[in-house]
């Protein structure tokens, strides 16, 4: 008798994706982040669902409903902090996942990579709208500043902003629609993640060497399921430690003050995971230029496959490219730091130099270095 998991219409999809999937025998722990992102998404959807049961998307009661969740709901504080810090863990896994893709040349799978870039944009949009919901000072002013950037678009900019706000400022209608979008987007993310996996399984996984692994495959289960479970345990350990010992470490104290349109906070800044893009935005004195640079800082990832000039896929055997990759990582950390600093000397010039270096590395320096490495190896 044939095994049910191989014949049943639903079970055979799961079987071919997670059980009998042929996987390269040499993939390292850097390949764990896909499953960790799936776990993060499940945590966010579940905690978000329970929060939505008690939250009210009204400017008069939003802030007090979050207070009510933390004080009066059974384990409400735990659910709220799991959701807030779960977003941080989501972005840590996301950045490491993208970094691994850049380092090992996974971007050569064009469809998978482009869906991934689309996923990154969607997750960023979801996180931004979620940050507005508690209706604290930073929620209100962050929403005002970021949505107002759309007014830089020629001709339709100001109309577009008023259309998004549903009025002349961020108000009740804006909060209600942000809550609606924040609720629906994670399910769209889940669907996109399914498409992401579909395209990945068309080609099979990449591996650290960047060479074809068709001659040496092993079963996904039990080898990589066990490996993924270890990663999940470490993720949950880190998340629970953060939630139980230092839940406000990554938050902003200003968000514990009720939103007040008449009182601007001294330093308006987004959550830590947007600071690198925020620093690039602030580095350009022109509004439209800043907005374009902000969008391009993420959209540049879609160009990476076309800038690949090396004859090797992975950076594993390319020491010069490796050095440049780690310079890029350091540059992004510098931008993250700058994004959280006030707009004054010397932070302005450091931010501008780091922004220039970011675009130069990806668009010019790394492709030229790859060509030089080809010549050094006489290819």
UniProtKB/Swiss-Prot annotation:
Keywords: Electron transport, Heme, Iron, Membrane, Metal-binding, Mitochondrion, Mitochondrion inner membrane, Respiratory chain, Transmembrane, Transmembrane helix, Transport, Ubiquinone. The keyword Transmembrane applies. Its cofactor is heme b. It comes from Sorex mirabilis. A ubiquinone binds at residue 201. The chain crosses the membrane at residues 33-53, 77-98, 113-133, 178-198, 226-246, 288-308, 320-340, 347-367. It is a multi-pass membrane protein. GO terms for cellular component: mitochondrial inner membrane; respiratory chain complex III. Its main location: mitochondrion. SUPFAM superfamilies: a domain/subunit of cytochrome bc1 complex (Ubiquinol-cytochrome c reductase), Transmembrane di-heme cytochromes. The cytochrome bc1 complex contains 11 subunits: 3 respiratory subunits (MT-CYB, CYC1 and UQCRFS1), 2 core proteins (UQCRC1 and UQCRC2) and 6 low-molecular weight proteins (UQCRH/QCR6, UQCRB/QCR7, UQCRQ/QCR8, UQCR10/QCR9, UQCR11/QCR10 and a cleavage product of UQCRFS1). This cytochrome bc1 complex then forms a dimer. The keyword Plastid does not apply. This is Cytochrome b. It comes from the Eukaryota. GO terms for molecular function: metal ion binding; ubiquinol-cytochrome-c reductase activity. Heme b b562 binds at residues 83, 182. Disulfide bonds: none annotated. Belongs to the cytochrome b family. Heme b b566 binds at residues 97, 196. It is found in: Mitochondrion inner membrane. Gene3D superfamilies: Cytochrome Bc1 Complex, Chain C.
């Amino acid at each position: 008798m044939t095994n049910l998991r191989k014949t049943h219409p639903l079970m055979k999809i799961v079987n071919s994706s997670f059980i009998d999937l042929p996987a390269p025998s040499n993939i390292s722990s850097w390949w764990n982040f896909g499953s960790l992102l799936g776990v993060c998404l499940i945590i966010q959807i579940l905690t978000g669902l329970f929060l939505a049961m008690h939250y009210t998307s009204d400017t008069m009661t939003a802030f007090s409903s979050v207070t009510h969740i933390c004080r009066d709901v059974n384990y409400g504080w735990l659910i709220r902090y799991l959701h807030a810090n779960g977003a941080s863990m989501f972005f840590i896994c996301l950045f490491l996942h993208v970094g691994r893709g850049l380092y090992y040349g996974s971007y050569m799978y064009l469809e998978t990579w482009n869906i991934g870039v689309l996923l990154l944009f969607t997750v960023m949009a979801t996180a931004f709208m979620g940050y507005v919901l508690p209706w604290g000072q930073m929620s209100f002013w962050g929403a005002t500043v970021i949505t107002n950037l759309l007014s830089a678009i020629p001709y339709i900019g100001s109309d577009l902003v008023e259309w998004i706000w549903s009025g002349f400022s961020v108000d009740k209608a804006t909060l209600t629609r942000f809550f609606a979008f924040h609720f629906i987007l994670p399910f769209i993310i889940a669907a996109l993640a399914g498409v992401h996996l579909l395209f990945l399984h068309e080609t099979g996984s990449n591996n650290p060497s960047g060479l074809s692994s068709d001659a040496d495959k092993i079963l996904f289960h039990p080898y990589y399921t066990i490996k993924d479970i270890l990663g999940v345990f470490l993720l949950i350990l880190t998340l629970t430690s953060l939630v139980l010992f230092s839940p406000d470490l990554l938050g902003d104290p200003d968000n514990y003050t009720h939103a007040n349109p008449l009182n601007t906070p001294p330093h308006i800044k987004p959550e830590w995971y947007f600071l690198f893009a925020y620093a690039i935005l602030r580095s350009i004195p022109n509004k439209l230029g800043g907005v374009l640079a902000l969008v391009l800082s993420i959209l540049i990832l879609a160009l990476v496959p076309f800038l690949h000039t090396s004859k090797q896929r992975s950076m594993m055997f390319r020491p010069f490219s490796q050095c440049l990759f780690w310079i890029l990582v350091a540059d992004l950390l510098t931008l993250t730091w700058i994004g959280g600093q006030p707009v004054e000397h010397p932070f302005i010039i450091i931010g501008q130099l780091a922004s220039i270096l970011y675009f130069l590395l990806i668009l010019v320096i790394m492709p030229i270095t790859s060509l030089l490495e080809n010549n050094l190896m006489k290819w």
